[in-house]
Design a protein with these regions (language model features):
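Conserved DxG motif in ATP/Mg2+-binding regions
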Residues: 160-173, 198
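Conserved short strand/loop->alpha-helix "switch" segment adjacent to the catalytic nucleotide/phosphoryl-transfer site
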Residues: 15, 19-25, 108-139, 143, ...
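ATP phosphate-binding glycine-rich loop and adjacent ATP-lid/helix-beta elements
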Residues: 172-198
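Short beta-strand/loop element within the Bergerat-fold HATPase_c
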Residues: 55, 151-165
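Conserved ATP-binding N-box helix of the HATPase_c
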Residues: 36-49, 124-153
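Amphipathic alpha-helical regulatory segments at dimerization interfaces
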Residues: 101, 105, 137-144, 188-191
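Conserved signal-transmission helix
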Residues: 1-23
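Conserved DHp (HisKA) dimerization/phosphotransfer helix of two-component histidine kinases, i.e.
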Residues: 32-116
Length: 198
């Protein structure tokens, strides 16, 4: 009996410590992401061209829209640290709600977006955080294209991982994989803790 109580207490302690470590890592990840996004917003705002003609007006508009995307990213990413408390994970309905909010954010900057969420198991906040990063990486890439439509599917890959598939449709004639924005996308994905293929 005493041995069982000790084993249970040991298990509970290890679980609590693992949860604390995961929470600490998530807070650090979110903190670093918000710092990078804030730096990006400051860079954008400090480099706005003066309003001299229609071309500069259009360029300012595009840059301000990009800053708006960064604000939305910060809002969604920061909410993860609050959303994880007292929760057993992010289930399909909760992820679908997040995806709908994200799609709504993107539509306000003329990136048409739709998603299918087909996960069967709840996901940890750190997984959702990595998915946010990847979806926004694709969204920033999509914003560089002509009349973009971004579609993505999130489903279970195996018992321990999920798979995010994204497809971008645009009116561009050029090969988008050869653009500087595509190189930025690949560089961003390389910096994430994800396996990917473009």
């Amino acid at each position: 009996q005493r041995q069982n109580e000790l084993l249970t207490a040991d298990y509970d302690l290890k679980t609590h410590l693992a949860d604390q470590e995961a929470e600490t890592l998530l807070v650090q990840d979110v903190d670093q992401a918000l710092a990078r996004a804030l730096e990006g917003m400051c860079d954008l705002l400090s480099s706005l061209p003066p309003l001299t003609d229609e071309s500069s007006s259009h360029e300012r508009y595009r840059m301000l829209q990009r800053a708006k995307m960064l604000v939305a990213y910060c809002k969604r990413k920061g909410s993860l640290t609050l959303a994880q408390h007292g929760e057993s994970g992010f289930d399909r309905d909760r992820i679908q709600l997040i995806a709908n909010e994200l799609a709504s954010d993107l539509r306000t900057i003329d990136v048409d977006c739709a998603s299918i969420i087909a996960i069967r198991r709840p996901m940890h906040a750190s997984t959702v955080s990595a998915l946010y990063d990847c979806v926004y990486d694709f969204a920033f890439f999509a914003y560089t294209t002509d009349h973009p439509a971004l579609m993505y599917h999130l489903g279970d890959h195996d018992r321990c991982s999920v798979e995010l598939r994204a497809a971008l449709f645009s009116n561009d004639d050029a090969d988008l994989s050869q653009t500087p924005a595509a190189q930025e996308l690949e560089s961003a994905l390389q910096g994430r803790n994800v396996a990917y293929r473009l």
